[in-house]
Amino acid sequence: MLVLSRKINQSIVIGDNIEIMLVDIRGDQIKLGINAPKNVKIFRKEVYEEIESQNLEASKEATADKLNILSNFVKNKFGKKQ
């Protein structure tokens, strides 16, 4: 893990198009500003972990019967790939 020190209004750059700026410090909390392209998904870690958990649970609910129904629908709707 890379650890950097920054002061308020200083930033770091990731790649060519992501900038993370330290906006404010109050007590034990900091505020970050993130400039990134709209196609880059940005989540707080606890939100991301919840999304992963829900996706995992949803995938467990996809039974073989449901997958077969979906497969048949796609084949009938779009035809088999040549």
UniProtKB/Swiss-Prot annotation:
Name of the gene: csrA
Quaternary organization: Homodimer; the beta-strands of each monomer intercalate to form a hydrophobic core, while the alpha-helices form wings that extend away from the core.
Signal peptide: none
Record flagged with keyword Cytoplasm: yes
GO CC aspect terms: cytosol
GO biological process, one term: bacterial-type flagellum organization
Any Pfam family: CsrA
Annotated compartments: Cytoplasm
InterPro entries in alphabetical order: CsrA, CsrA_sf
Protein name, entry field: Translational regulator CsrA
Keyword Transit peptide: no
NCBIfam families hit by this protein: csrA (TIGR00202), PRK01712.1 (NF002469)
GO MF annotation list: mRNA 5'-UTR binding
General function of this protein: A translational regulator that binds mRNA to regulate translation initiation and/or mRNA stability. Usually binds in the 5'-UTR at or near the Shine-Dalgarno sequence preventing ribosome-binding, thus repressing translation. Its main target seems to be the major flagellin gene, while its function is anatagonized by FliW.
Coiled coil: none
UniProt keyword annotations, A-Z: Bacterial flagellum biogenesis, Cytoplasm, Repressor, RNA-binding, Translation regulation
Similarity section: Belongs to the CsrA/RsmA family.
